[in-house]
Amino acid sequence: MKKDKNNESMKLKVIPIGGLGLIGMNMTAFEYNDSIVVVDCGLAFPENDMLGIDLVIPDVTYLKENIDKVKGFVFTHGHEDHIGALPYILKEVCVPLYGTKLTMGLIERKLTEHGMMRSTKRKVVRPGQSINLGEFRIEFIKTNHSIADAVALAIYSPAGIVVHTGDFKVDYTPVFGDAIDLQRFAEIGKKGVLALMCDSTNAERPGFSASERTVGRTFDNLFAEHSHNRIIIATFASNVDRVQQIINTADKYGRKVVVEGRSMVNIISTASELGYLNIPENTLIEVEQMKNYPDEKMVLITTGSQGESMAALSRMASNMHKKVSIKPGDTIIFSSNPIPGNEKAVSKVINELSMKGANVIFQDAHVSGHACQEEIKLIYSLVKPKYSIPVHGEYRHMKAQGKIAENLGIEKDNIFIMKAGDVLEMDANAAKVVGRVQVGSILVDGLGVGDVGNIVLRDRQHLAEDGIVIAVLTLEKYTGQILSGPDIVSRGFVYVREAEDLMEEARQVVEDSMEYCISHHITDWGKMKNSIRDSLGEFLWKRTKRRPMILPIIMEVE
């Protein structure tokens, strides 16, 4: 961190690029003088009405406009909502990456898939270490979360210290590694902290979050209770500690383990290579080897805990999985809670599994990876910030944390419930939102990044709801007379064979519309198409009370 007396009067800028007011797409820029450091680079998953969209990533126009200032991306942990946008963002903002060992391992697998390893500088940082990036010094502080190697960040600048918790919980008995370094939070608090940016996800939940080890005891009880059944457990692929406890319990009860789902296989492979998973020899087998073992000696760890249609468990439930079929008596354990918005999809999968005779367990086999109210209070009490900036979560979650901060004695004017794009300037004397930068959501559809916008989504929704009717006709170039057609083609509107009378009337409506244009000397194709669109649309609405997309196609021959 550079020290310059001329800079002491400058203010630190905090600019959330994404991740506020929604779950996912976490990214925050810290700017001081000629230096910008970006914390996290996450994606969000599409809403149900974003038809055909694969991923949503943040708009980084501000970073591109200030690319000479950007010193690097620093990561709090390896979840997709914190690292998932990297392959897309690095094509426009290619700067060095800094993260802990497992986080960087997951990032490197992602970069390898996209052929970006050689072009990207990376550095592994251990908890307790610090790095210097321009005007900033950034210290990595050990925390606990639902993935190993999670850290908080103490961001030092000439304007003061900002503590960013990342996603965290206080777990005194973690499955892997050490407990959260509360002592370091307290030591930094004694130095004087300008602002605390704290995880808000569970700010509405009273008390403390349960330790991850309690899930291990639940697994032990369930394995003992269902000792004569095949067990299938769906959980988040990134929850390495959860996977470790499943493997430990399977080993205790003499069961073999099969891993299904691409993301689950990839993360378990990476975590095992880096030493974050301890898998007893001969415990893991390939799915093809299951037939060699009785059901009561098998455990499957699978993706699909959120009801994702293409995940392994969903494909098993709908008979679409090529290698695993659900049998009556199978015990299916959902070791997760539905993310808000996924409840209907999860319920659908549970119903499909139940109809196949499986025993589905979806309670008491999960604990949250996020701090509840008492843990949030503990961090505030240790850090003692001047300003509170709730992050991570929906607006109501951030509002709930703001209330906690106020109850702990932070002045209301020093609590900032920000929106993505807000520019907060602060120093020891004052803090204020002084403006906004361009932010937003970039939609990823296959290989296309940002080429699908609201108009395309609206068209897709229109097609999904009411279908399409295409009117095709051929005109003589010089006279404008109809030579062939109109032919009516329908998809997703009515079944043509059962609506021949309607289609014949529709042809007549199009023909009448064209004759009107010819008699009134309307020769502009755009106006002709609008006439067809209006008259056919009005006719179909009167007859069906539906408004399909209407696509007139006019061809011209000599």
Regions inferred by a protein language model and the residue ranges of each:
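A glycine- and charged-residue-rich anion-binding loop/surface
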Residues: 20, 44-48, 52, 69-70, ...
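Hard-cation-handling environments
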Residues: 205-335, 339-522, 529, 534
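Conserved beta-strand scaffold positions in the cores of enzyme catalytic domains, especially
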Residues: 14, 122-124, 195-197, 332, ...
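Solvent-exposed loop and beta-edge segments used for protein-protein assembly and interaction
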Residues: 22, 147, 294, 463-465, ...
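Conserved hydrophobic residues forming the short capping helix/wall of the S-adenosyl-L-methionine
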Residues: 111, 405, 540
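Short glycine-rich phosphate-binding loop at a beta-alpha junction
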Residues: 96, 389, 551-552
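His/Asp/Glu-rich metal-coordinating catalytic cores
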Residues: 2-74, 79-292, 311-325, 344-347
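C-terminal tails and terminal domains of large nucleic-acid-associated
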Residues: 521-558
